[in-house]
Amino acid sequence: MDPRFNTAVEYDITLTPEDIDGVIPEDLCGVIFRNGPADFRLAEHEFDGDGMIRRLNIAVDGSVAFLSRYAETAKRRIEADSPTPKVRGFGTQIPGGPLHNMSAARERGNAANTSVMRHGDCILTLWEAGKPYQLNPSDLSTIGPYDFEGQLDAKIPSSAHPKFDPTTNELFNCGIDYGKTTQIVTFRLDRTGKLTTVARTPVAHAPFVHDFALTSKWCVYLVGPADISLRPFLTGLKSVNDSIKWHPERGTQIVLVSRD
């Protein structure tokens, strides 16, 4: 790992107005959550650092509270006292060669380190290839994996970049189902909390689809010419990162999926 990526420590700090130089404007108040990789002890790629959630709370009385906690994922528990990686990540292989990595090919090294969102009274921390983890908003303690009350297909990972439409109170997200035919799975969460699969859209090859855009009518996917070569990954020879190949001759495909 690049030595510039230092492992972060957890903080719980509260400042009163007397502790602050100057005065915070009265209309600047509220809570903001942030997430990102922060523990790089075992990571061979910055995307594999364990996720740390940070909460900054500016109260109406001018006090400021900052809290940061690691998401206590299965990955973090497994690797807590280990000197070497125990779970494959985006760019991290476990020791022991291809056979060890092949046996772990389907384990999801969910680091819960990419983004954070609010869903009702829940705070969810997201990762690109697995279920969200639910956190307690008061102390950021980890409750566990969250599947929207059993509605999220365990076989289809959800993206870490959902899109919310404030005019309809609907949340859209996607996952990639890599199989004999690769499919983009688009799903919608309505204002009542019901999750519906909107479409399963076949695409060529095994594209690396990271994000999408949302309009009033469409979910818009830019499917670029970057593919994941599944064979070297599934046989334990390479990580996901090292299995991504660029095929510029294919160009970029724009896939439109109706929200309805």
Q: What residues fall within each predicted segment?
A:
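N-terminal regions that are enriched for targeting/export leaders
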Residues: 1-103
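Structural core positions within WD40/WD-like beta-propeller blades
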Residues: 33, 54, 124, 172-174, ...
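Short, conserved, GDST-rich strand-edge loop motifs in beta-rich repeat architectures
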Residues: 37-42, 224-246
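Beta-rich catalytic cores
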Residues: 49, 111-112, 158, 208, ...
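Well-ordered mid-protein domain cores that form the structural environment of catalytic cofactors
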Residues: 73-195
